């Protein structure tokens, strides 16, 4: 059963109010965190790069993935029209813990290491303020879990299975945090943010 069906404009997550956690570098990159409240996920799929954030709090529809897919020469499928026919599912559960959006490329080892892992800079920064912060993930298309190399990497970084939750469209998340890419965010050609080498 659905509770809402309507067409809404899509906004980039960092076109709304954010908090800057690292100043802009010489290539125009900076690290920001966006906070979104009363969130449910919608979109073509729950798998990267398809999820959209719908905020019950302010009725915004938000694109959390701002990446250029170099092999395709474009961004996500939403970026042609920047609107979507929203179909919000009935809420079956509430997630009270703050969650950090981490639905990025975990299917390809190179992209996971180079593009996806740097998103964790924002996660670890925010975990200082929100010790119970969870990492919100989604498995690759056609899978029901993350690949072992992802879990192994999390373990090396001190992220346990208890720190990770899987995205569910029937869950309402009280607070979702979205962080900047250190290699994308509309700047796929310039060198990555220097923080990536820490």
Predicted regions and their residues:
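The feature primarily captures lumenal catalytic ectodomains
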Residues: 1-196
């Amino acid at each position: 059963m659905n509770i809402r069906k309507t067409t809404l404009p899509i906004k980039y997550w960092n076109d709304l109010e954010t908090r800057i956690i690292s100043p802009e570098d010489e290539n125009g990159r900076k690290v920001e965190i966006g906070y979104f409240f009363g969130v449910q996920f919608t979109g073509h799929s729950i798998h990267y790069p398809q999820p959209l954030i719908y905020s019950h709090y302010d009725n915004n529809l938000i694109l959390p993935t701002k990446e250029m897919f170099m092999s395709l020469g474009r961004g996500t499928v939403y970026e042609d029209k920047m609107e979507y026919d929203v179909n919000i599912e009935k809420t079956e559960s509430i997630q009270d813990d703050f969650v950090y959006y981490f639905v990025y490329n975990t299917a390809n080892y190179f992209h996971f290491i180079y593009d996806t892992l740097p998103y964790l800079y924002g996660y670890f920064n925010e975990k200082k303020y929100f010790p119970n912060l969870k990492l919100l993930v989604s498995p690759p298309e056609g899978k029901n879990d993350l690949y072992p190399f992802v879990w192994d990497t999390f373990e090396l970084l001190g992220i346990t299975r208890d720190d990770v939750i899987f995205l569910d469209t029937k869950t309402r998340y009280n607070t979702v945090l979205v962080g900047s890419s250190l290699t994308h965010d509309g700047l796929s050609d310039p060198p990555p943010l220097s923080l990536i080498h820490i």
